[in-house]
Amino acid sequence: MDNNVYLLRQLPDGPQVLIDAADAPERILELISAGTTPGVSTEKPGLAAVITTHSHWDHVRALAEVLSATGAEHLAGQADAAAMPAPVTVPLENGQQLDFGGLRLEVIGLRGHTPGSIALLYEAPGTPPQLFTGDSLFPGGVGNTENDPQRFGTLIDDVEQRIFDRLPDGTVVHPGHGRETTLGAERPHLAAWRARGW
């Protein structure tokens, strides 16, 4: 299964943050090493944190190895923490603000795909907001809720209220699988998603 992983850094020399250590730990560690600030003496690649968007197996296959190799903190939604294959050092809640040396992320809880699924919002002046949604929002719909109407209702409500009702159409959505999209491209389909129930 193809997954997206995202390595973020506040330029020029801020700490690196990884979103979803999904698979291929050796490749992820190569990317982290390539981004480590030259001249900084460190025994481990420079990674401040791994943020896991949710506890499903396809988003955590490289987690233990990346954490062990880097000594990074592990952040994830509070309600998913017990299901993670590696300890969560910083449990996250909706609305929490994170700051990694100037790289600021807002935690947006999107319950439904899993109880503790989160998205991460990055905003900077002069650029469109960047939203990392894990498996909660994709081009064409919300994440899988296993045909459970209650879980679907919770997820579509969270997606509408916490994302579409407050963020502009230019917001770029970076999902856990597949290509990116924008909120503007997806907004016209919200009613159809709700009507079909997935």
Q: Which ranges hold each PLM region?
A:
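Core dinuclear metal-dependent hydrolase active-site scaffold
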Residues: 7, 96-125
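Short, compositionally biased "basic patch" segments
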Residues: 1-8
